[in-house]
Amino acid sequence: MSLGKRLKEARQKAGYTQKEAAEKLNIGNNNLSNYERDYRDPDTDTLLKLSNLYNVSTDYLLGKDEVSKKNETDLLNKTINEAIQELKDEDTLLFMNDGEFDEETARLVKKALKNGIKFIDELKKKE
């Protein structure tokens, strides 16, 4: 599979339109389209940004690795950070003071995350 096809597939799996991905990457929609159609290859910095946005390895995009996922820690960190950002954007984290946690809140968030992950593990075992 070509780089362009892998880019398009990774973008679609990540749930982005070309326009949305281009905006997040701060590149023109035409540039992204050219990458996906194999008219041009992205430079190294852009390839890394694409990899991070789509949560795939650069090796996967370049066809050196058939596994599209980065390691589980990267995915977990990304998921947690996105969830916190979404909550901030929704003004849900009312317990934050100027965007910062106090020590007690940080401890409670950590405990909630650990319990949530344990719960997910138990659900997976039952499947």
Curated annotation (Swiss-Prot):
- GO: which molecular function terms? DNA binding
* Record-annotated HTH cro/C1-type domain positions: 7-61
User: Which UniProt keyword terms apply here?
Assistant: DNA-binding, Transcription, Transcription regulation
Q: Where is the composition biased (Basic and acidic residues)?
A: 1-12
The parts of the chain that form a coiled coil are none
Q: Where is this region: Disordered?
A: 1-22
Q: Does Signal count among this protein's keywords?
A: no
Q: Which residues bind DNA?
A: 18-37
Q: Matching InterPro entries, A to Z?
A: Cro/C1-type_HTH, Lambda_DNA-bd_dom_sf
One Pfam family name is: HTH_3
- The entry's protein name is HTH-type transcriptional regulator ImmR
- Provide the organism lineage as a comma list: Bacteria, Bacillati, Bacillota, Bacilli, Bacillales
Q: Which gene encodes it?
A: immR
